[in-house]
């Protein structure tokens, strides 16, 4: 009683103040005494202690009805009312939490923001007399799979397991219609925690279980595993959230009805070569993914996990280790290709020989790869220059696919370069594709801003100091800009850019190559010449370039390399002669 008197004194209230008045005055007085507001810290501590004791006392208060000493006559025409003392349900929850602190795992008492907004299980608390009526109304209005009714210290607890997720506010507002005087409180139970909560409730002293229609032997359905989605995105190296969403939703269908799983094993034509192995493992998790509302957000988080993995590799691995790991992945793809159909091997060998016709100087390719690995400052860019349709982009795209990196367009206005350059974050190399500038005489080429923009990116080209790169919705990253290749038609090459280039490679028209490529339409349609497997195989079959590849890597894939050389040697003379005549190799 003394603590209550002191509390009302601090709150400037009479001793007879109601619980609602005390709570309202507490919020107002707390602002007055709060240290951050210039108040008294000691009084604030005292006020919080007294208020906590008051809440505990309110939670222990029992329901009472007070009878009038001089009741009205039975037929006086006036209605009679009971003075009902309503216990503070938050206090009851506080006492319940105090008895069993581990129940905080299953639902939140004070911080409703931490609750799931649409759980499928709810905990209701009301009076024992109101419970039967309220339960009947709930069964009429909601689809209910099961329930549990328990009595504890004068109140009734109802655990509802609904057929579909329902907002906490929806259940609470429905119950309030029938609980105008009786206490009523609704709490959402976290997903897949209903059985654990019930077991915890049964251990509370003084709790009596009245009804139970929930099967306690049924194991909770497995929850969607975010980690599986993230690992899958990293596995397929997907940095497009919408593409990942579409791919993962298709894994939800049964494997026996999946068109991809029914296809013959052809890793060249199938975009996701690991689909047959991934589908059974992810099918259940993907079916749960279909019922999640924020699918795009989860896929964006998975894409962030892919970018984070790249950032980790960039920070912890040397460039030589990164390229060696990439070669290992491409060699596995070559092994699967050589184990495939003969028709696919024929096209693969044709692509290798066509690449040899387009760019026979393998030493330049080796020098480019070594420069990409060493990444020396100043002179670390290669310029591919030549007329239109001479194979500049084909060779550059093959190198980019083998090393991995980003293709950048710098022909726009300078204000558009900021986020374009941000695509180079954590990349191994970059390709400045089809850079425009001032046309050379008699070329009839359009002019552009590309050369001017590159000239203004001297720190990026030199790689001597870190530069700030930025992606949308991400913080700036300071890093050494990656090395790369510049492709251009016959534009005037500024001296300042040429001074920062390692080599200028000139391309010319090769009529026989163009004719052979047109006649071998299957190679053209599958874009096999720009595939990383084609370029690496080209390096492996040339003796002068094979020795530049790591010896331990060649020893690890010795059988694959020998099989590759056998397939090429078996077809070389026939295919090479027909290609140099501009004919299709299959005729």
Curated annotation (Swiss-Prot):
Residue segments, region Disordered: 58-78
Which parts of the sequence belong to the SF3 helicase domain? Answer: 360-520
Q: What does this protein do?
A: Isoform large T antigen is a key early protein essential for both driving viral replication and inducing cellular transformation. Plays a role in viral genome replication by driving entry of quiescent cells into the cell cycle and by autoregulating the synthesis of viral early mRNA. Displays highly oncogenic activities by corrupting the host cellular checkpoint mechanisms that guard cell division and the transcription, replication, and repair of DNA. Participates in the modulation of cellular gene expression preceeding viral DNA replication.
Residue ranges forming the DNA-binding region read 102-219
* Domain remarks: The J domain is essential for multiple viral activities, including virion assembly, viral DNA replication, transformation and transcriptional activation.
State how it assembles: Forms homohexamers in the presence of ATP. Interacts with host HDAC1. Interacts (via LXCXE domain) with host RB1; the interaction induces the aberrant dissociation of RB1-E2F1 complex thereby disrupting RB1's activity. Interacts (via LXCXE domain) with host pRB-related proteins RBL1 and RBL2. Interacts (via C-terminus) with host TOP1 and POLA1 allowing DNA replication. Interacts with host TP53, inhibiting TP53 binding to DNA. Interacts with host preinitiation complex components TBP, TFIIA and TFIID to regulate transcription initiation.
Family matches, as PROSITE patterns = DNAJ_2, SF3_HELICASE_1, T_AG_OBD, ZF_LTAG_D1
In alphabetical order, the GO MF annotations are: ATP binding; ATP hydrolysis activity; DNA replication origin binding; helicase activity; zinc ion binding
| This protein's name | Large T antigen
Q: How is it modified after translation?
A: Phosphorylated on both serine and threonine residues. Small t antigen inhibits the dephosphorylation by the AC form of PP2A.
Q: Give the Enzyme Commission number.
A: 5.6.2.4
Per UniProt, ATP binds at 386-393
Stored InterPro entries: DnaJ_domain, Helicase_SF3_DNA-vir, J_dom_sf, Lg_T_Ag_Polyomavir_C, P-loop_NTPase, T_Ag_DNA-bd, Znf_lg_T-Ag_D1-typ, Znf_lg_T-Ag_D1_dom_sf
Which of UniProt's keywords are assigned here? Answer: ATP-binding, DNA replication, DNA-binding, Early protein, G1/S host cell cycle checkpoint dysregulation by virus, Helicase, Host nucleus, Host-virus interaction, Hydrolase, Inhibition of host innate immune response by virus, Inhibition of host interferon signaling pathway by virus, Inhibition of host JAK1 by virus, Interferon antiviral system evasion, Isomerase, Magnesium, Metal-binding, Modulation of host cell cycle by virus, Nucleotide-binding, Phosphoprotein, Viral immunoevasion, Zinc, Zinc-finger
Q: Where is the composition biased (Acidic residues)?
A: 65-75
Main EC class the enzyme belongs to: isomerase
Entry's Gene Ontology cellular component terms: host cell nucleus
How many cofactors are bound and how?
A: DNA helicase activity requires Mg(2+).
GO terms classed as biological process:
DNA replication; symbiont-mediated perturbation of host cell cycle G1/S transition checkpoint; symbiont-mediated suppression of host innate immune response; symbiont-mediated suppression of host JAK-STAT cascade via inhibition of JAK1 activity; symbiont-mediated suppression of host type I interferon-mediated signaling pathway
User: Known Pfam families for this protein?
Assistant: DnaJ (PF00226), Polyoma_lg_T_C (PF06431), T_Ag_DNA_bind (PF02217)
Domain J positions: 6-82
Q: Where in the cell is it found?
A: Host nucleus
